[in-house]
């Protein structure tokens, strides 16, 4: 493991993989993890977790060396594949017939998945999408340092797909000393906009970093979301104060733990601050509304290396005639229009147009067009 402030770089496209015979097939989650490990997005990790680090992360939200890390980044293989592997071997990492990297095997172990589910997701309920995915993936984990030997082709968002070293450079070029990161898997609605702009009042720049890796089936597709972010930024944000780039990771839906993970990753991308709103990275009713904020009290800002900014649930108040939160609005619930990505999705899928208090009209137009296309292709 590298030191906390150092950006890991394990990309080497000249690496000779021809002599390596054995291979491990990567699913989409492991493939996106491979890229983020190699480009420093997951610094200080240099590879998939071995047993010692895995146990430590699951039980204590820290690596074995004490560094804060809250989500186990693992490489699952089947029992059949595991039987062919040995510690000390170098093995190719493949997906769709392409070799994307290699792993130097340091560990092969069988995890206690029920324990992982309970501690990471706070539930063993298979209706939870993160738990479901955990149980679906193979049952043996392979740990070890990796090298990314081939960059991904057919990247759906090439102009927005930047490595941490590139986003850091971009912020520097813009003269931003303080940058706030915002994680989203939903189209940006008015409550998000209010929070982002409130944060923008106290920092130099906003880094809008939507997740475009694997998400659950009823989330709005990434290409539709990206178009919605583009029209929003074009029409309602100062161009020199906002930067848009994608986060290629898969969504874990691990609530509080994922909030810590998202903050650590944005630190690697160059952020000094990170927005944590209500039910960050949550799903259903598995986590408390502000549980993802409360978990940060277990860590100092120094050891995280990034400052979390906590925001209460915001809403449109018909009496204030403005976006507000309980901190700024004295009126009762009957005057509050509660906004959420789930509600916007629900309205759109029912063929209803969300009111302007929910979403900007340009965003709604993009979403309607995108969802019509989705219906046609289903």
Swiss-Prot record:
BP term (GO), one: hydrogen sulfide biosynthetic process
Keywords: ATP-binding, Nucleotide-binding, Nucleotidyltransferase, Transferase
InterPro entries, per the entry: ATP-Sase_PUA-like_dom, PUA-like_sf, Rossmann-like_a/b/a_fold, SO4_adenylyltransferase_pro, Sulfurylase_cat_dom, Sulphate_adenylyltransferase
Entry keyword Transferase: yes
A molecular-function term among this protein's GO annotations: sulfate adenylyltransferase (ATP) activity
Catalytic activity entry: sulfate + ATP + H(+) = adenosine 5'-phosphosulfate + diphosphate
EC number in record: 2.7.7.4
Pfam families: ATP-sulfurylase, PUA_2
Pathway(s) per entry: Sulfur metabolism; hydrogen sulfide biosynthesis; sulfite from sulfate: step 1/3
Family the entry assigns: Belongs to the sulfate adenylyltransferase family.
Alphabetized PANTHER family for the sequence: PTHR43509, SULFATE ADENYLYLTRANSFERASE
The protein's name in its UniProt record: Sulfate adenylyltransferase
Source species: Bacillus cereus (strain AH187)
